[in-house]
Amino acid sequence: MWKIVPLCNKQLRDINKIDILHNGHFRKCNTYKSGGGYDKFPQIAEKRLGKNVFNQFIVQLYGCVLDCPYCYVTKDGYFGDYVLYSSKDLVDICVKEGLEIFHLMGGSPALYLEDWYEIIELLPNNIIFHSDLLLLEKDYKLEWLNSIKTSNSLYAINIKGVTLDDFYKNTNREFNVGLFLRNFDKVMESGINFYLTFTNPDKRYLNEFKDILIGEYGKSILDDSFVIDLIEYEALKD
């Protein structure tokens, strides 16, 4: 069973009422529009998977390992009272709503990485499974990653800082370098389909950080990567 946190009152400030689903337990949105224009997921999905998709079903899981001050989900949205859903229930709702992308979101959705395959196996091939990895939730197992490598899945690795100070500023957490690198190596070994995003990076050091990644993993590691600049969400205005 999945711990799903319904939309909280702060989140609702930024959500169109027509996008609220299932009594506020879920929402839908246009992928490009939802990011204020920054999200390149539709273009990447078309390039990598050959699918022209925009409309996503958003499932918000309980829990997060970070404390990002800019997070529009807010603590109420990932540490709020949760309700339980089975994988089949979630997939059935997505299919019924006619949505093209199943977005398993957080918080930190990879806290549940070992269970993602349950949803993926139930999804029709015409629906893309999308979720996010921080590489910091816990030690990944290669078998978990192998279980989510499919022709209709696409993942984002979200990098929250390009220096130790930058990471702390963005997350209120110390950067666990060893865990990050161990998980990055396992992701690379697994061959899952992913791209990188850089959230609010210190741009003075961004290219230097990218060079480190290229030196470790090759130039292709940056294919389709992009920067996510911060947006002033209504959810964060008290």
Regions found by a protein language model. Give the residues of each.
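N-terminal [4Fe-4S]-dependent radical SAM core
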Residues: 1-65, 69, 73-78
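Auxiliary Fe-S-binding modules of radical SAM enzymes
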Residues: 1-22, 182-238
